[in-house]
Structure formats: structure tokens, C-alpha cells
Amino acid sequence: ISGTVDGFINILRKSTDISADIDISVKGLNIEHPLIDWQPYKLSFFRFSGVAVADIGKKSLKSENSKISLGGIDGSFSAKKDDTGVSFAVDINKVPLNKLETLVHNDVFKGYLFDGDIDLKVTYSKEGDAEPVFSVTGEVVEPLQISDRLNYLKEPFLFNFIDRNDQPVSFVVGEGNRDFIALDYIPEHVLWAVIVSEDAGFFMHKGIDFEEMSAAVKDNIKKKKMRGGSTITQQIAKNLFLKRERTLLRKFREVILAIELDATLSKKRLLEIYFNIVEWAPGIFGISNAAWYYFGKPVYMLTPLEGAYLASVIPGPYRYNYQFQNGKVSEKWIENLHRILNIMNETGHLTFQEYIDSVKEELLFRPKE
């Protein structure tokens, strides 16, 4: 970490209380850490101002409504630590979406010009041995893409991707690619199997789902491993524009791009792109190739159970491929497929009779050559 620090700390002690009036700013902040970004992160300006109060007798520390500024984006910060536990809250109101790009430093935002705001509040608390409580709430307010930089995605475009083996993948998404499937030709039960499994709020959110973010971070804290919590739109952003590394800034870039994509493209076009660029098995891109790879049939012939299976492997096309290689699916996995089908039935995307017929069906892969 490097940068130029300026400011003051005034300390006042009264009995067992120690209060510190703090106003610290850092210009030209440089941070190198693999969890932050794959390259050194540079922030033009950071400022923290507020009062921190410590009670030596009670062994407590708190700061309320302190002010923070990150590159011109302002918010408030509160925190408390005592013998009952620890908590903090960050509140950022009405940040212009056009300002967010200044924090991420990436060529994929060339030509980025956006209108609208975002409100965001992050809270965390943990008392004793209880599970930590984490929440992310917010709202994207009237997002509007001013530039036309993503309009090319409304037409057939060339998809370029580097797979997990660092091999380039390139194909046209649209007419000119015989494997391309227009959304209207994907059965509703396949479409909704993926939506309820990957992003149930797809048609309601504006690219990002704050509730799912909270659930993902809570899982990450509890299980001490990464779970993305990405919407379908975020997954599109990641596949179209970003590197594969897992860093905080890559996730932040993904969020900004998802908001931009949602404001630029129709939900129908987003789904059409998604179904045609997703990797469903090692080296198997697009729903058409996936249908032939797993079941030896065209997309329109897929059953609800087969659609549920395709939805279930999206999070791990390499990790879950052993089932196809073994030629069978475990009972536990079948239970998961039935859960997806049940959600589809309860949400009106599968009739009760279709649900009953589907849970009776045996999942059969195509014979391997």
C-alpha cells in the first residue's frame, strides 16, 4: 500500500472514555493484493472523517455516522465493538451510475456514459457465538444508457472467450451460426428451468439482485468459500467482457456492466444471448450443442426433466461432467432436479400433470460413442 497521507487525529480523554476526532485523506492510493485485483489498484482519493469513542472500562469502541469518500463517491460509516459482539454499516445514497466507472479502471468501460443513480446499504453484525447477520439492500434508480457502445449486442456479434484451459473460443451469436437457437425456439419448460435455478428474479431486477447478494456473502462467510450470487445478466457480463480471476474489483465491474446491459438490451435478448454462450459441459457452448451432447436430440425435443438437468450443471460444467461420463445421475442429484420441477409447478411454469409425469421420468443420457 502506498499514497500520500494528510489530516489530523485529535484525542481527548475523560475518565475511562477516549474520543478521537479523525479526518484523514489519502491521495494517489495504490494497493497491490490478489483479492483486490489482478493488477495494482489505484484510487485518486480516499477520505475518512468522524469521531471514534473508546470506553476502556467496558472495552468498547464505536463510531457513528462517520463520513467516507472513495474517489468522489461519498457515504456514511458506523461501527461498534463491545463484549456482546461487533457490527458495522455502510450507507451510500444516490451515487450517479456514471461515477462508478471511475473506481474500476478497466478498458471494457471505454465509451461508458450512463444516467441514473444507485442507493446501497451494507450491514454486518455478529453477537457471541451466533451466526453473523449480513445484508445488502439497495435500488438502481432510473438507469439509462446514453452511449451506444453496447448496441452491437442487439444484432449478431462475434463472441470471444478464453476457456479455463486458456484456449480461445470464438463463434457468432446469431444468424450465420447453425448452432444458434433463437429464444422463441427454446421450450418454455427449458427456459424456466434455467431461470428458477439461476435467477428467479430475472424479470424483476435491473441487472443485479441485492437479496441474492446478501445470501451469497452470508454463504461465503459461513462456509469460507466463494459463491458468486450472480444474476443471469451478471453472468453474461462476466462471459462477454471480463477475465476469469476471482477478485473484488472483477465482481464490482461485473455489477456495473450488468446494470448497463439490463438498461441497453431487452430481457428477451439477454436470455437469447445467455442460452447461446453458456458453457454446459467442457467445451460445449450453447443450448443446441448441450442438447445434442447430453441427450442426442434437438432443443425442441427436450423434456422438463432434461431441461432441469441442463439448468443444474450451469454452475459447474467441468465439475459436474462426471455424471455424464458415468452414464448416470445420483439419487441426490435427481432430488435436486425434482426440486427445480416443483418450483416450476408452484410458480405456474409447469402444470401439475406435467410435474407428476416429469418426476416419474427416468433421466437417460445419449449413448457415448
Describe the role of every protein-language-model region.
Residues 1-2, 11-19, 26-369:
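Juxtamembrane regions of bacterial inner-membrane/periplasmic proteins
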